[in-house]
Regions:
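Long, helix-rich, hydrophobic modules that act as membrane-proximal anchors or helical bundle/coiled-coil regulators
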Residues: 37, 41-174
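Charge-rich, amphipathic alpha-helical segments
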Residues: 1-58
Length: 174
C-alpha cells in the first residue's frame, strides 16, 4: 500500500511539473538528455533521480535557474562520474605517502590513484583499466571543483564534496 502511495505521489508531482511553465522546461531538458545518449542504466538512473528530486522540490519558477544550472553540469558528466559522485557517502578513507604541502589539510595532488585503488577494492573492482578510469574521473571531479582531499601525513585522508559537489549530490541521491 505504501508503494502505491509513493507511485501516486510521484505521478502527481510529475503532473504538477509538466503543467508548470518552468517545470515543463526542466522535465523536457531531462527528456532531451535521455534522447541524446544510447540507453545506459546508470545514466537513466541518475536522470530519474534528478527528475524525482526536481519534481519533489516544487517551486519550479523560483528554483528554475538552479535546476537548469545543475542539469547542465549533469549533462556534461559521464554516467560513471555521476555514479562515483552519487556514492560520496560511501567513499573510503585511505592512506598514502604524501610528499608535498597542504593548506589547512587540503591536498591538491597525488591522492587520485591511492584513493581510486582503495575505492575500487571496496567495490570489488580489480580490472586495472577500470581503476585507471576511476583515477581519471577523480581527477576530473577535483579539477571541476566537485571534490577536495583532506588529511595530513601519517593520518587517513578523505575526499569531501565541495559546495558545488554537494549541490549535484542532492540531485543524484534519494
Amino acid at each position: 500500500l505504501n508503494k502505491t502511495d509513493n507511485h501516486e505521489k510521484a505521478i502527481e508531482n510529475l503532473r504538477e511539473a509538466m503543467t508548470d511553465l518552468h517545470g515543463n522546461a526542466l522535465v523536457n531538458k531531462i527528456f532531451r538528455m535521455l534522447s541524446d545518449y544510447p540507453p545506459d542504466g546508470d545514466w537513466f538512473k541518475h536522470l530519474q533521480t534528478a527528475l524525482r528530486n526536481i519534481c519533489d522540490s516544487k517551486n519550479f519558477e523560483k528554483l528554475f535557474d538552479i535546476h537548469k544550472f545543475n542539469l547542465g553540469l549533469i549533462e556534461k558528466m559521464s554516467p560513471q562520474a555521476l555514479s562515483i559522485l552519487a556514492d560520496a557517502k560511501n567513499w573510503p578513507r585511505f592512506h598514502f605517502e604524501y610528499i608535498g604541502m597542504s593548506v589547512g589539510g587540503k591536498i591538491t595532488d597525488q591522492f587520485q590513484r591511492p584513493f581510486s585503488k582503495v575505492y575500487a577494492n571496496k567495490k570489488n573492482i580489480a580490472d586495472p583499466l577500470v581503476i585507471e578510469r576511476i583515477v581519471h574521473i577523480i581527477n576530473d571531479l577535483q579539477n571541476n571543483g566537485f571534490i577536495e582531499c583532506y588529511g595530513q601525513q601519517g593520518s587517513q585522508f578523505k575526499l569531501e564534496l565541495t559546495g558545488m559537489g554537494n549541490s549535484l549530490y542532492e540531485y543524484l541521491s534519494d
